[in-house]
């Protein structure tokens, strides 16, 4: 990190715990992304609601919330938890400009609230993805005492590319967050961002009315 900072590069690590956030601040990070386990891809153990305020209280650099955010409600909630901003992933995978395979986008749009699964916990590399023939087979494989870590890792090698590039429904790892069930359509990035910002602004402006 020192080399990057000396070069004038802003370093904003993704963290899944208070301890790691503090460590990153000590190392000179410009900000941290507090990512809850609702996120797609590699995840930690704490959810966003619990993680973000604890990290906000523990560090003196900006905190960006991530995990389970796909609309203005999530943005407003994150700001109320103390975050300076948000990082979104799943909702932008279905943006018109995103170059992933259409099968990937369509699977996210079709997903329900319970359609994700976390695999890789056994070997310390938990990943959240959509439930597919591949992810179910991976989960079953890692639960077997007769299968080694090397065999499991070999089974999963290249699976993200098979999803994102090839659109392989059976062999691809379609990483996505639990918020996938809230993503209902493929839209331009501009529309996604503007709708999130507008909804968040309305909610925050009207928040005091909920206390009356």
Predicted regions and their residues:
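Alpha/beta enzyme core
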Residues: 1-64, 71-90, 170
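Conserved active-site-proximal phosphate/metal-binding subdomains
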Residues: 50-64, 70-212
């Amino acid at each position: 990190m020192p080399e990057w900072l000396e070069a004038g590069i802003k370093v904003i690590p993704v963290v899944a715990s208070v301890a790691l956030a503090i460590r990153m601040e000590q190392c000179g990070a410009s900000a941290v992304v507090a990512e809850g386990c609702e996120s797609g891809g590699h995840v930690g153990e704490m959810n966003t609601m619990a993680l973000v305020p604890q990290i906000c209280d523990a560090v003196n650099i900006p905190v960006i919330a991530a995990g389970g955010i796909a609309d203005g409600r999530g943005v407003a909630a994150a700001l109320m938890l103390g975050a300076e901003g948000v990082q979104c992933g799943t909702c932008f995978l279905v943006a018109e400009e995103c170059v992933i395979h259409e099968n990937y986008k369509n699977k996210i749009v079709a997903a329900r609230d319970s359609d994700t699964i976390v695999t890789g916990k056994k070997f310390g590399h938990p990943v959240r993805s959509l439930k597919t023939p591949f992810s179910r087979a991976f989960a079953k494989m890692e639960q077997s005492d007769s299968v080694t870590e090397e065999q499991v890792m070999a089974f999963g090698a290249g699976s993200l590319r098979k999803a994102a590039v090839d659109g392989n429904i059976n062999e691809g790892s379609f990483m996505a967050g639990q918020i996938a069930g809230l993503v209902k359509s493929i839209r331009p990035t501009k529309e996604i961002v503007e709708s999130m910002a507008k909804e968040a602004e309305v909610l925050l402006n009207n928040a005091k009315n909920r206390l009356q």
